[in-house]
């Protein structure tokens, strides 16, 4: 029994690691697509694409996955992918936005609607929750190995054209106007900074606490959305209390 139990524990950890790795690859694929779509598909002529490709290699993302994401943007793979945004409410009334890249709108719409419905949420009309989010540029720089304190980093960010900065224990988060993200990114790179993230994202104005009895349903919704191959990104205005605090 102990050997059987040990095997299941190992398998369980492996499955969790595989799921986490898959979500990382999914986000990188989205970033590759957007970088290639917005600029030249040749990384030598596209700094943003080059940055994301470096991140993909660091995450040990297979070469064919990297190329597939770029092909989606250029149409080289033969399929015509569309960008579609879905908006809705998760369990507890939490606003959720789902960005998709799909070659079959009917398939994607059915899957997204099913995810919301089966989790106790509801899919809304265009504009039903997007007003609760702000579109912003986000640049992240890891603090590890960085010879800069918070004040110096803030001055460099503002000089580069950023709007604001927040510091956490492990990183600096630099916020920009969406149209200025590229120029701020380039200015920081010219100063020698290594960027962990440089993207335009959706940031909620306020977060809604998920009721304790809805946390399981809510997490099921997010997991189902993120596991869908058509889903490029999920933005949520949720505050989820730690399990230990909720009990």
UniProtKB/Swiss-Prot annotation:
Q: Which GO terms describe its cellular component?
A: cytosol
Specify the domain of life of the species encoding this protein: Bacteria
The UniProt keyword set, sorted, is: Cytoplasm, DNA-binding, Transcription, Transcription regulation
**Main localization of the protein described in the UniProt heading:** cytoplasm
**Where do the record's region annotations for Disordered lie?**
1-22
Its family remark reads:
Belongs to the TACO1 family.
Known HAMAP family for this protein?
Transcrip_reg_TACO1
Task: Identify this protein by name.
Answer: Probable transcriptional regulatory protein LAF_0541
């Amino acid at each position: 029994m102990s050997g059987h139990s040990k095997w299941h524990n190992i398998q369980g950890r492996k499955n969790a690691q595989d799921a986490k790795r898959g979500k990382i690859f999914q986000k990188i694929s989205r970033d590759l697509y957007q970088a290639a779509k917005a600029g030249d598909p040749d990384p030598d002529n596209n700094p943003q694409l080059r940055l994301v490709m470096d991140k993909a290699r660091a995450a040990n993302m297979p070469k064919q996955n990297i190329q597939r994401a770029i092909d989606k943007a250029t149409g080289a793979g033969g399929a015509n992918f569309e960008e579609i945004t879905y908006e809705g409410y998760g369990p507890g009334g939490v606003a959720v936005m789902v960005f998709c890249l799909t070659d079959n709108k009917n398939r994607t719409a059915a899957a997204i609607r099913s995810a919301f419905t089966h989790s106790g949420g509801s899919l809304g009309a265009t504009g039903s929750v997007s007003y609760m989010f702000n579109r912003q540029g986000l640049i992240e720089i890891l603090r590890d190995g960085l010879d800069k304190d918070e004040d110096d980093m803030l001055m460099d960010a503002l000089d580069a054209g950023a709007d604001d900065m927040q510091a956490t224990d492990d990183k600096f988060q630099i916020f920009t106007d969406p149209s200025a993200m590229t120029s701020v990114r380039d200015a920081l790179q010219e100063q020698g900074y290594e960027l962990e993230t440089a993207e335009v994202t959706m940031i909620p104005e306020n977060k809604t606490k998920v009721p304790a009895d809805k946390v399981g349903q809510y997490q099921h919704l997010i997991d189902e959305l993120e596991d869908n191959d058509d889903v490029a990104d999920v933005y949520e205005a949720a505050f989820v209390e730690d399990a230990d605090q909720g009990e």
